């Protein structure tokens, strides 16, 4: 999430990126965590909240703009209830969105219109481990020609986090999981204990780790490295078998902002007349067809429960098998973009809710933890040098450094 504060514009398209993430990802996840706590479900989860995002979530001006955005969403959904009154299926969905937007407003007000108040609470309760990130989401390995630039990125991130959360960060999400040699030395200087890496950083480490990504490794500077598990990753990310592509889930690309008559939708889109997403989407994925069917919330929630059960069963079997071949506790690290949960995959927060609840049931033999607690409980890990890598295509830097953009790096390094 880039820094998108534009008071010089009456209606900023970029600010809507933040507002959409707040309504579709962060507030729904806050609601999930609150309900789990209320129901006495023991859980631990880890989230990266970048310095720019923390700053924006605390910004009074942006919060005022978000409140206006949310009130507009409620107003639009109320008009949709009227507009769709002759279509029973659409009218039911219009009521669903109206109730949803009002619930989002209630949660927003509950935390005094500062979402970091919620995340700080979860941090204090020990259910949420908040990771920092580099100050401006810089791909750090491409800045090694100027090491002081990398140091400034980490120093600023740690300072920003400490001022906002109230203590220093224990872990960091390196942008795009991008690692290169000696980066851990700078992380150690600023008190970072661990980071998350792409699986190849572990699998191709030297010497080769005994247990692959099922345990972290330690760099020679004492920084623990947790590798992404690819089996659990594919079950969510894969365009062929990933859960979010199920035909019963909500279709992302069909929004009334693009389909409703301009004279009707104009007050709710960009004031320049640019059609944009409103968050009200009436169709399900259906399949590879333009003839989409109406979204059925009840059927989508049934699929959420099925997929959460499948995911929990898979992790249970995976860990039970690993235990038979290990003399230490195996760990599965499942990192995903936060925006997947609620924005791209509308039902994503519901999936997290169901998975955590199933993980607390007796039939699962594992427990949810976070990287820092795992280190405390398993302080002896293999020392190995992680392989330079990213979680981008080919696990290298080519997405960010290639013939289409290499010219800019000379200018950046000046």
Q: How should these model regions be labeled?
A:
Residues 139, 192-205, 367-370:
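His/Asp/Glu-enriched short active-site or ligand-binding loop at hydrolase and phosphoryl-transfer sites
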Residues 61-124, 130-144:
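Active-site-proximal, glycine-rich beta->alpha crossover segments in alpha/beta enzymes
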